[in-house]
């Protein structure tokens, strides 16, 4: 069940079935660091923590800009309403994807702090246990032909539901110890029926794999799974 807190420019939405004793202090980075509730993670440009709360492990992400505006605005975005914030859009998309029974993290809470014309935002998702990033899984030499095909099938299921992942790369795909693939970090992602976005998403993954995996056979692997996905 979704619960909403509004207080002096603060907008918080949380899943009360997942976090039963919610306290907005879990969005306070100073508090969670001093209380030893978290550890910092290196995940892209966002400030990200692994958070231990109520005997569950969560991923806390603070939204940060990239590209040209990063140095100017850093973590601030133009405010046009709570529903239009990056955090709320990612919340809504993850909830929608869950209804398709696709492998994504469960969203737990979001926070939006409004200023005069701008806002800052955070998102908390439940950690998917016993997983590692695709990049590490491949480097461990566990990625065989069967698993490449399984990855292709997983991506195809997302695309068939019209889900465009805006930053599909080797860090945003997780592999569980039972060899199941998960997609994470859906910031700026959306649902569309335009196939060009799915090809754009796959092209991003292609570049990420070629850049990070020094294997002369990687291009052939990618060509094979591309055929499976878009056939």
Descriptions of predicted regions:
Residues 168-175:
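Hydrophobic residue at the +6 position relative to the catalytic HRD Asp in the kinase catalytic loop
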Residues 129, 170, 188:
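Short, glycine/acidic-enriched loop or turn micro-motifs at the edges of active sites
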Residues 24-132, 156, 160:
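Conserved ATP-binding subdomain of kinase catalytic cores across diverse folds
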Residues 146-157:
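Conserved alphaE helix
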Residues 133-141:
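AlphaC helix of the protein kinase catalytic domain
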Residues 1-39:
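Juxta-kinase regulatory segment immediately upstream of eukaryotic protein kinase catalytic domains
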Residues 162, 167, 185:
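Conserved catalytic-loop position in the HRD/HxD motif
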Residues 176, 180-231:
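C-lobe/activation-segment region of protein kinase-like
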């Amino acid at each position: 069940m979704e619960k909403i807190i509004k207080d002096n420019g603060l907008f918080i939405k949380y899943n009360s079935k997942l976090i039963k004793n919610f306290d907005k202090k879990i969005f306070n980075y100073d508090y969670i660091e001093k209380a030893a509730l978290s550890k910092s993670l290196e995940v892209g440009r966002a400030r990200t923590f692994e958070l231990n709360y109520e005997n569950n492990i969560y991923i806390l992400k603070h939204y940060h800009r990239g590209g040209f505006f990063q140095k100017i605005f850093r973590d601030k975005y133009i405010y046009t309403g709570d529903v239009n914030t990056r955090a709320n859009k990612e919340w809504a998309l993850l909830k929608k994807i869950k209804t398709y029974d696709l492998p994504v993290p469960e969203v737990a809470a979001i926070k939006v702090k409004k200023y005069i014309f701008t806002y800052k935002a955070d998102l908390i998702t439940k950690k998917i246990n016993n997983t590692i990033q695709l990049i590490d899984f491949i480097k461990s030499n566990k990625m065989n032909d069967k698993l490449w095909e399984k990855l292709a099938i997983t991506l195809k299921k997302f695309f068939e539901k019209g889900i465009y992942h805006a930053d599909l790369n080797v860090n945003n795909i997780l592999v569980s110890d039972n060899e199941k693939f998960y997609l994470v970090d859906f910031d700026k992602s959306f649902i569309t029926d335009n196939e060009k976005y799915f090809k754009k998403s796959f092209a991003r993954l292609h570049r990420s794999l070629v850049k990070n995996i020094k294997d002369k056979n990687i291009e052939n692997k990618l060509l094979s799974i591309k055929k499976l996905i878009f056939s």
